[in-house]
C-alpha cells in the first residue's frame, strides 16, 4: 500500500482482511498490555476488526508505505462501551498489526491522539 485509504475503503479493507481464513495478526507489546489492563480478550479485537468502522484519517506507520487506522466498535465483552483499535493493515500479506486497544470514552477525555503513537514497540 502506498496511498492511504479513505475511511470507507479502510473499513472495507480491514474487515475483508479480518475475515480472510489466511489472516495473521501480530500484537505490539503496548497492545497486549492494554488488552490485559482493560480486561478485553482476543475475540473482542477480532469482533471489532470484522464489524467495526474507521471514522478518522490515517497516520503514517513506521513501515514505509503503510498507514495506521483506528477502527471502532462495541464488542461482546465491552458492555455498552466502544473500543478503538489502532491497526496497521498489510493487505498483500493478509496481516493486521495491532498497535493499541483503547476505551473510546477514555480516549475522548484525554488530550492528544493515540493514533499518533509509534507502532515500533
Which residue stretches match the model-derived regions?
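Ribonuclease/tRNase effector modules and their secretory precursors
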Residues: 1-121
Amino acid at each position: 500500500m502506498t496511498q492511504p485509504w479513505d475511511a470507507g475503503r479502510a473499513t472495507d479493507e480491514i474487515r475483508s482482511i479480518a475475515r480472510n481464513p489466511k489472516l495473521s495478526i501480530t500484537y505490539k507489546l503496548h497492545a497486549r498490555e492494554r488488552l490485559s489492563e482493560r480486561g478485553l480478550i482476543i475475540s473482542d479485537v477480532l469482533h471489532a476488526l470484522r464489524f467495526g468502522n474507521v471514522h478518522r484519517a490515517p497516520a503514517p506507520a513506521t513501515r514505509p508505505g503503510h498507514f495506521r487506522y483506528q477502527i471502532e466498535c462495541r464488542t461482546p465483552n465491552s458492555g455498552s462501551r466502544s473500543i478503538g483499535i489502532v491497526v496497521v493493515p498489510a493487505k498483500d500479506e493478509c496481516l493486521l498489526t495491532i498497535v493499541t486497544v483503547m476505551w473510546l470514552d477514555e480516549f475522548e477525555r484525554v488530550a492528544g491522539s493515540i493514533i499518533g503513537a509509534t507502532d515500533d514497540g
